[in-house]
Amino acid sequence: MEGWDKGTKSVVGEIPLLSTRAGPRDGEAWRQRLKEEYRALIAYTSVNKSKDNDWFRISAANPEGTRWEGTCWYVHNLRRYEFPLQFDIPVAYPQVAPEIELPTLDGKTHKMYRGGKICLTVHFKPLWAKNCPRFGIAHALCLGLAPWLAAEVPILVDSGMVKHKDDEAAPADAAAAASGSAAAS
């Protein structure tokens, strides 16, 4: 993991590696893999909370564990920007990494594919391939989504492509106040 900062290496070292090579079509082996995925996610979340770096919530959206949904956030200029997060587990998983989607950012950056899938091809996918099947969902979040958010959110905010929820509500509140004062006249 050359090129990663010490903090990232430290966190990745605390996420348990997975051992079961199984995908959604592998029956009982997939259920075992899901147990390992949950253990790794719980460990990663615990590490983040202990370091005051809590930045996502995620859970399986179906009983099979093939669809995942949640929320991730990034703090920029002391303001928290939240984004819905989703992805499907590919049929060829774990050989193929999940394609993480942030649908509300679709079309706002060049480092994203259609549908809001974040671009992970250059930096993350070779690392995933090298560490298959030991990497799982927690590793995809840590080494894929987290650096992507750190690189892209400040640019999107500074360019005006992403607005803080308080800034979006302010014009609507001002318009309501203006129409209220006009009605009172």
Swiss-Prot record:
The keyword Nucleotide-binding does not apply. InterPro entries: UBQ-conjugating_enzyme/RWD, Ufc1. GO terms for biological process: protein ufmylation; response to endoplasmic reticulum stress; reticulophagy. Keywords: Ubl conjugation pathway. The keyword Nucleotide-binding does not apply. GO terms for molecular function: UFM1 conjugating enzyme activity; UFM1 transferase activity. CDD domains: UBCc_UFC1. SUPFAM superfamilies: UBC-like (SSF54495). Gene3D superfamilies: Ubiquitin Conjugating Enzyme. The active site is at C119. It holds the Pfam family UFC1. Belongs to the ubiquitin-conjugating enzyme family. UFC1 subfamily. E2-like enzyme which forms an intermediate with UFM1 via a thioester linkage. This is Ubiquitin-fold modifier-conjugating enzyme 1. It comes from Oryza sativa subsp. japonica (Rice).
